[in-house]
Amino acid sequence: MWHGVFIRLAMRCCFLAMGLFGMSAQAAVQHSHAITLRGAPALAEGFRHFNSVNPDAPKGGRLRLDALGTFDSLNGFINKGVAAEGLNRLYDSLTAGSEDEFGTRYGLLAKRIIRDPNDASWVIYELRPEARFSDGHPLRAEDVVFTFETLLSEGAPAYKAYFADIASVTALSPLRVKFRFKHKTNRELPMTVGEIGILPKHYWATREFNRTSLEVPIGSGPYVISDIDPGRRISYARNPDYWARDLNVNRGRYNFDQISYQYYRDGSVAFEGFKANQYDVREENKAKTWATEYNFPAVTDGRVILQRQRHENPAPMQGFAFNTRRTPLNDLAVREALSLAFDFEWANRALFFGAYTRTTSFYANSDLAAQGVPSKAELALLKPWRKQLPAAAFGPAVTPAKSAGDGYDRANLLRAQALLKQAGWHYRDGALRDVAGTPMRLEMLLVQPEFERIVQPLRRNLARLGIDLSIRLLDVAQYIERLRQFDFDLTVTGVPASLSPGNELWSYWGSQSADTPGSGNLVGLKSPAVDALIARITQAKSRDTLVTSVHALDRVLRAQWLLIPQFHIPFFRIARWDFFGLPNDPPRYGLGLDSWWWKGSPNIAQER
């Protein structure tokens, strides 16, 4: 049915009205090398390579990276165990994205993408006949069908939330797969199905998918697993027979012959490992370390290079997350009161050397962050939910209170005390108690010991209010399992943000995901208003509509005080041993690590 030329010729043999109707319907269907949310792709068909790469980058050498904790599984698609780092390098997806462009994907496994921009109820991906898995087995439409059926039935909850709107996945032929969706208004879904790594049906036919395993899996991506030291180290080797090594989306990328991850107990031990040249590249997330500890000999003599690489990504919302499933954290007034006890201005000065900006929005550092009072268009989206939403959602965008920066802001703590009284909590006999006399005791769950110094000032201010906050530090496996089961009061989390948000919002904030173990909805939010706004975001036909809808969502989330916002920086802090070549122009929306290359070192034998 997709041979448009023959259809149009046939229609011309019919009477005029019938022919015009057929031509109009056919003209809406597009066959393209790329898929976009809105508008045209930046790179035309036949482009040579992505912009922020060196197409002539040499192949060879190695890249050593770090990871924290441990791992016990090579299956990152399920809600069990702790998956090893880097597994995404094993699997190709239908499309590939450029770190210079958002809202666009280009064909990788897919040679052609067929769709109707005015009807988002379906999309067809036509596969490249040369696509192969690493064992040489052809990759075909049945593998795509198997992947989505398996992830929806046995995969981690995030897949079920993300792809809940898939009605069917059908192999039309060995090289064509059709996705049908339950609604024709979700404009993002035809593109996002192209982002998932495709699994080999023939490999999993004799294996149990939903279990942890250290058996080396088969993939179709640029790397294969070459060595494993369970829980301590995993190494990947560039596949010399990689089927897509010469495709334009891969030119200048995946240049290292070897990529390995060395695991460390915590960030402090990992930093010592970097200083000892046990791995090559470190993204520094501690302001104090960046300001005071990069003064070791390899830095001063130029063997280690420090760089701040700006990006245009919205900042993730990092904060102390409340589990609103639990009393008293299900009370909005209590959550706002606890938020007033975090003195960011003091922490930024005393702990972070003034390096950070307070995060005030779930889309900070972007045009998606709500500002000031709601516009008429935003109010139109919010008004139907006035009775269900906090009044603050209809006023100026909620922002965390500022302090004098002395670590003990009396005005903020008095406001917190008033809110707690409003919620029925009163200070007596040395503790904050409810009407039954039960003291307020909370637990902060942590996995990184470095965060204890950030939590302690919050703990002291809460103690001044009569609240007992204990700190529980767990190993990675215990921590992940506690979060999967929502077994916590407070924890540190980071909610990713996108310049083109969509289906991922169902996992982060959707009501259905609130009670699904392992989902991204850590805070337990259940809100019909939020569900309606997410639906509108996924259906937005224009950028203006998307921005307005995200502004409204941002206002609602901020007014709920679901977490205590922390801080961000608009750049990457990178320390790297001087073994690498980098493209002249860094990407706008990422670090671009896959486009680096090995430039060599005379002492590589000793450095391994």
Q: Can you say where each PLM-predicted feature lies in the sequence?
A:
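Aromatic-rich, solvent-exposed beta-strand/loop patch
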Residues: 109-111, 116-118, 134, 139, ...
